[in-house]
């Protein structure tokens, strides 16, 4: 089996490639390294460096069995500062991958976002990811291209970014804790998030890809799967896990943020036999043990 992973040098893409290689896939990555890192490269994967917002996909003559389209400029705040760059990158790269998949009849698993449920017009990022979903459904219905949409909920885990505009909440807290810095929290910290470990996300992606390639794929093609833990925590509760008395600083509320994310759709449970089994508190406890020694 041969898989193409876009965004393969980034947070989720790197974890996905590690899993695919362990499952004996041949893997090729495309990444423009805007947030991906070459130190994330995995032995056994072939990496290409170019921008998918341009209509070009390198083709060495080998047909891929499945495409995992993970590449995107993520995060709400950077997209508010530069909406054109975010929309150009996210929408055009998705359109180009779908057209490539259509030309070769290659199934595509698309990385969606739970922001679709909250404020699809609240930021360029949310709109661009929602628009990508619409393009997937268009190509599925008009051109019979097998597609699956997997929506992510506040992903955390190995290879997450620890600083900069694209860092995750957990990544920022981890960096601040390691450096004995105050934890920074936007707004009042009461906003709740469904945090999902990247290994669970990867498991959902791989199961989606396998389902598209297996018998009965007509049931799977066109589906939208919510990949969330089904449990949410306030940011204050997450900060408490690093120590109830650990210092924290509250920053002004930011535009585009929403009050709650929570996965309640069990479609992935029923059709993919997917279950999230990683626990946020256990993850943070392990982090503290590793860094308090």
Predicted regions and their residues:
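Residue-level marker of alpha-helix boundaries and capping positions
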Residues: 7, 88, 126, 164, ...
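Gly/Ser/Thr-rich beta-alpha loop segments that engage phosphate groups in nucleotides
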Residues: 9-12, 38, 114, 159, ...
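NAD(P)-dependent short-chain dehydrogenase/reductase
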Residues: 124-126, 130, 134-193, 198-209, ...
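N-terminal Rossmann-like NAD(P)+-binding domain of SDR-like oxidoreductases, especially those catalyzing
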Residues: 1-155, 177, 205, 274, ...
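C-terminal substrate-binding subdomain of Rossmann-fold SDR/epimerase-dehydratase oxidoreductases
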Residues: 51, 178-293
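Short aromatic-enriched loop/helix-cap "lid" or pocket-rim segments at secondary-structure transitions
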Residues: 38-41, 60, 160-164, 198, ...
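Acidic donor-diphosphate engagement hotspot in glycosyltransferases and nucleotidyltransferases
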Residues: 16, 120, 160, 200, ...
């Amino acid at each position: 089996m041969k898989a193409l992973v876009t965004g393969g040098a980034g947070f989720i893409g790197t974890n996905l490639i590690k899993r695919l290689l362990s499952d004996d896939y041949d893997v090729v990555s495309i990444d423009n390294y805007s947030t991906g890192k070459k130190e994330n490269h995995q032995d056994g994967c072939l990496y290409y460096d170019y921008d998918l917002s341009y209509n070009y996909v390198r083709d060495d003559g080998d047909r891929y069995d499945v495409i995992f389209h993970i590449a995107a400029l993520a995060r709400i705040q950077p997209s508010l500062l530069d909406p054109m760059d975010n929309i150009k990158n996210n929408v055009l790269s998705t359109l180009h991958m779908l057209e490539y998949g259509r030309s070769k009849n290659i199934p595509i698993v698309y990385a969606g976002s739970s922001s679709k449920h909250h404020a699809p017009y609240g930021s360029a990022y949310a709109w661009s990811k929602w628009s990508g979903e619409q393009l997937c459904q268009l190509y599925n219905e008009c051109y019979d291209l097998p597609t699956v949409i997997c929506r992510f909920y506040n992903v955390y885990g190995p290879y997450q970014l620890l600083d900069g505009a694209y860092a995750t909440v957990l990544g920022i807290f981890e960096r601040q804790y390691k450096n004995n810095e105050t934890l920074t929290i936007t707004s009042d910290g009461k906003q709740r998030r469904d945090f999902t470990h990247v290994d669970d996300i990867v498991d959902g992606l791989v199961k989606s890809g396998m389902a598209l390639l297996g018998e009965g794929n007509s049931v799977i093609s066109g589906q939208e799967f919510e990949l969330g833990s089904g449990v949410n925590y306030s940011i204050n509760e997450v900060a408490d896990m690093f120590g109830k008395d650990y210092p924290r600083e509250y920053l002004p509320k930011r535009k585009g943020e929403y009050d709650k994310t929570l996965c309640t759709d069990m479609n992935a449970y029923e059709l993919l036999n997917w279950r999230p089994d990683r626990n946020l508190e256990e993850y943070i406890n392990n982090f503290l043990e590793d860094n308090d020694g």
